[in-house]
UniProtKB/Swiss-Prot annotation:
Gene: GUCA2A
Keyword Secreted: yes
Purpose: Endogenous activator of intestinal guanylate cyclase. It stimulates this enzyme through the same receptor binding region as the heat-stable enterotoxins.
GO cellular component: extracellular region
SUPFAM superfamilies: Proguanylin
Organism phylogeny: Eukaryota, Metazoa, Chordata, Craniata, Vertebrata
Compartmental location: Secreted
Protein name, per record: Guanylin
Entry's family note: Belongs to the guanylin family.
Keywords: Disulfide bond, Secreted, Signal
Length: 107
């Protein structure tokens, strides 16, 4: 009985920690899952199209699949810089999962 209880407790703690990795950039904090979605958006065919128009927000912000959690970044004057830093993490999220980046917490 004690073994079962201990196993259930450990499994519950592990499940709680799996989704707990957050990525911080300045005052912003995002789940690692939202940051991982940036990689898919960058590889989308519509992200390769570049026009000569000047955008108020970075082109990624206009994509339909852009994570809602990241939308506040699009309103910042340095949004492209923030998204570029998040994109570095999105390219290799495993390094964030083991806390190799200072921006990652909750591993």
């Amino acid at each position: 009985m004690n073994t079962f209880l201990l196993s259930a407790l450990c499994l519950g703690a592990w499940a709680a920690l799996v989704g707990a990795v957050t990525v911080q950039d300045g005052d912003f904090s995002f789940s690692l899952e939202s940051v991982k979605k940036l990689k898919d958006l960058q590889e989308a065919p519509e992200s390769k199209v570049q026009g000569r128009r000047k955008f108020v927000a970075p082109p990624l912000c206009s994509f339909s699949g852009f994570p809602e959690e990241l939308r506040p970044v699009c309103k910042e004057p340095n949004s492209q810089d923030i998204l570029n830093r998040l994109a570095v993490i999105a390219q290799d999220p495993s390094t964030c999962e083991i806390c190799a980046y200072a921006a990652c917490a909750g591993c």
